[in-house]
Amino acid sequence: MLEFIENNESTIRVGFFLGILMLMWLWETLSPRRTLSVSRLFRWINNLGLVVLNTILLRIIFPAAAVGMAVMAQQNGWGLVSILDWNPLLIIIFSIIVLDFMIWLQHVAVHAIPAFWRLHRVHHADRDYDTTTGLRFHPLEILLSMVIKFIVIIALGPPVVAVILFEVILNGMAMFNHGNVRLPLPLDKVLRILFVTPDMHRVHHSVEDDEANSNFGFNLSIWDRLFGTYVDQPRAGHDAMTIGINGFEEKNEVNRIDGMLLLPFKAKMNGYVINRRSWK
């Protein structure tokens, strides 16, 4: 099974991506959580167009990507995992958990460091919130994220299959927890004990400073609970809360691909970054 995953990485990743995207589209159509303010077709064309651009850019600059770095680390015996005499399955689980924590930490960093926040604003400027929001990131942030991932992989030395599984899980969970979908509240309450749910992560996309700087997790909810950044519900409620960034309301700027590409270079920094915000 592990060998099959390694040998069919691209097929597995593309298959899961398209499958989950279509499932989320169907779920959002049948059971939406909120009424969207912008045409879904317009947003999907532009958000997914940005995904295509990012994919091409990554293939040009980092053709081997994270999996290639994991292969190199394994071949050269780099990282913590190389000195651990553990069961292979335990090492895979451990590696996925460590990678998830590092993604959480990276997410905190892009809110805390002004230059990084400029890039991350593209993700938060979406005035609606659906599964494609979880995929829209500025190309420079995608490249930054890959460099950070390389450093983590070199230090950790995770099995190749762990990196593949993590990438599939991260992509799928990002689409799930950004979904404009309605979960039964009892189910949401149980799921978010361990995992990030759409209602939990939606709080993070609030225009309110303290809410936007909470719930940083993409996969596991435990990091926000452990480090005191967990917020249960938005003050205004999910139906009435405002999503996006104050000062970024113009449709073409926040929803059209050319506007998204230019957005980091527009406007002065405001008080929205963690280390410059005013708490309420």
Predicted regions and their residues:
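Structural signature of hydrophobic alpha-helical transmembrane segments
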Residues: I12-M22
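Short, strongly hydrophobic alpha-helical membrane anchors
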Residues: M1-S10
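Membrane-embedded catalytic scaffold of the fatty acid hydroxylase/desaturase
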Residues: V52-A65, L80-V81, W86-A240
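Loop-to-helix transition at the N-terminal end of transmembrane alpha-helices
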Residues: I12-R13, V38-V52
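Cytosolic-facing loops and C-terminal tails of multi-pass membrane proteins
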Residues: A236-K280
